[in-house]
């Protein structure tokens, strides 16, 4: 019996928006009426949302959203879960729909070339000379990452511009394929690299989640961190054994939960000494 009754969707679009003071309560009221949970971030440069609810409610949300032509043609990431992975519904005004802290970066004007999941898969199969670059945070890469990927060990995405300055100079002439969970960070990260003089920068279209869906996840080691109470998904897009530490919110594997440095609701290996 399939108990995966909750539909999870995520999407984003870089699009100039005005009248945000009207849009925010409009989105909040609609999501509340549909009993959806998750987040919708609106900014002068676009929308970024992650929502969960019944299939009917999600369908009604999409009809509502697409009544505004600015929100048409948004590619969606869809997964299913047994339970609601979000605690509340929030619609927020943001300066940026993904925070980088660089006013000069606009993906509508400059961003890296997209490559499909199948193209990245073929690069691995053919052992191509390519630098696979992870743009996610350290607590995400610890859960899983692509085979031979360069991990920048970021604390936050805002650290990305500084981190690439420390990459080997020869990378500027190499073919680079970057990736993140769903694609939004790479829209900006690829522009940062192009402006910094990296000549051949591509981004994985749809991110890791689309790679799992389209290829089955070969060449991925581990699971993929997601920003909700499921914590991580495996290559079949199913929930895993990862949990959050109740105190510090670090993702914890089964092995870390078995550590003597873990006590439920009190401490974990990452916060016991803090």
Please identify what each model-predicted range represents.
Residues 2-113, 137-175, 184-274:
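Rhodanese-like catalytic fold shared by cysteine-dependent sulfurtransferases
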